[in-house]
């Protein structure tokens, strides 16, 4: 539910793609207002308990990175 809430909160500002693979998960976030993107790939073995809370934290960090790029860019 945390991921759904995150998307409802930020979905008008960013486009999000989450790709699940055998060994990792890839997050790609695009700022809707500009042509900026942020991509993170996380190997499953790097995170002890990969759950919704961890995914939400990753999304928050990516969102902050996009905002920082918009301010500094």
Predicted regions: what they are:
Residues 13-56:
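Acidic, low-complexity, intrinsically disordered interaction modules
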Residues 1-2, 67-73:
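Short intrinsically disordered terminal tails
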Residues 1-17, 51-52, 60, 64:
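Negatively charged, low-complexity tracts enriched in Asp/Glu with abundant Ser/Thr
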């Amino acid at each position: 539910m945390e991921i759904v809430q995150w998307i409802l909160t930020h979905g008008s500002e960013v486009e999000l793609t989450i790709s699940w693979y055998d060994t990792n998960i890839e997050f790609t976030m695009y700022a809707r207002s500009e042509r900026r993107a942020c991509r993170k790939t996380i190997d499953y073995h790097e995170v002890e308990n990969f759950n919704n809370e961890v995914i939400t934290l990753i999304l928050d960090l990516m969102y902050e990175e996009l905002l920082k790029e918009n301010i500094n860019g």
